[in-house]
């Protein structure tokens, strides 16, 4: 086949990619300022919430609901075979043109990058990457 290298994710990466980690974090540190309520059983009541699949990618199979359960926004995808998780909604930063931003911090032994994904209410695979440089 002529391959010189094969790159595999280590098994623990599956844990870090699973949104089930969000529920575990919530269950072990309920009401922490930096965490959102999360549940496997049912949607959160009387508050805006998001339904996601455990192993979805780039906004696929994500839906946002208002406080009474009306769907506000949704994205189809190929991950419906996975279990769903419900999480409190957190409003992303928004610019004057109505675009939303999701921050990302990158580490390689130390903080080395800051970037934002810019897109719609559900950040998906059509989102732009907006890099930043900090001196």
Regions found by a protein language model. Give the residues of each.
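Domain-scale recognition of functional cores that engage charged ligands
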Residues: 1-135
């Amino acid at each position: 086949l002529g391959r010189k290298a094969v790159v595999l994710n280590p098994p623990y990466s599956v844990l870090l990619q699973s949104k089930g980690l969000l529920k575990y974090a919530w269950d072990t540190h309920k009401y922490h300022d930096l965490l959102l309520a999360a549940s496997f059983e049912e949607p959160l009541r009387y508050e805006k919430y998001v339904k996601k699949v455990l192993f979805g990618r780039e906004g696929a199979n994500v839906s946002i609901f208002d406080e009474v359960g009306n769907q506000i926004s949704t994205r189809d995808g190929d991950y419906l075979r996975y279990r769903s998780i419900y999480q409190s909604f957190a409003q992303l930063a928004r610019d004057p043109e109505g675009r939303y931003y999701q921050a990302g911090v990158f580490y390689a032994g130390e903080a080395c990058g800051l970037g934002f994904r810019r897109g719609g209410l559900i950040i998906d695979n059509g989102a732009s990457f907006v890099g930043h440089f900090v001196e």
